């Protein structure tokens, strides 16, 4: 079984990671961890041309920290893991779905919300779009309170 866990470093993504690890311990398979650094073009930010490279580098550095931490957790739990960072994707949900299609994953395990602003009563926009467009089943994990 191939399981994909997209992670942004949020507590919800971490809960999804631990859920996927438990699933893989019960059924042998491979874990794919993915973090996606959004492109600045897709953001509603006013940035001077000179600052855009600095901001993008900052986002990429943060993405590297996120994926490295998640990979360390998975390695520590003894599961087979492939870690990938996608840089400057115009759409985070599209990057997740594209990765799932390319790697032919069997299941995506994703947190209900990420680091973005979100309402208590609606699923995060990334998770919602992944559920609608994924080529496989999607297990949406709520954070344990």
PLM regions: where:
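General small-molecule cofactor/ligand-binding pocket signal
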Residues: 32-34, 82-86, 139
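Solvent-exposed polar/charged
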Residues: 22-25, 101-102, 132
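Short, flexible loop segments at boundaries between secondary-structure elements
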Residues: 136-145
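Small/aliphatic-rich secondary-structure junction motif
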Residues: 2-51, 73-77
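Structural beta-alpha unit
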Residues: 72-108
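A short acidic, glycine-rich active-site loop
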Residues: 51-65
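Glycine-rich, Arg-bearing micro-motifs that act as flexible, cationic patches
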Residues: 107-129
């Amino acid at each position: 079984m191939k399981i994909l866990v997209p992670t942004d470093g949020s507590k919800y993504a971490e809960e999804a990671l631990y859920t996927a690890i438990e699933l893989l311990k019960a059924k042998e398979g491979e874990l794919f961890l993915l973090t996606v650094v959004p492109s600045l073009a897709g953001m509603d930010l006013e940035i001077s041309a000179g600052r855009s490279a600095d901001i993008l580098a900052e986002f990429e550095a943060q993405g590297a920290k996120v994926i490295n931490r998640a990979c360390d957790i998975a390695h520590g739990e003894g599961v087979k893991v492939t870690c990938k960072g996608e840089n400057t994707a115009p759409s985070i949900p599209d990057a997740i779905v594209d990765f799932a299609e390319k790697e032919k994953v069997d299941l995506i395990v994703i947190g209900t919300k990420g680091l973005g602003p979100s309402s208590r009563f609606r699923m995060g926009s990334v998770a919602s779009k992944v559920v609608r467009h994924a080529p496989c089943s999607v297990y949406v994990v709520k954070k344990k309170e």
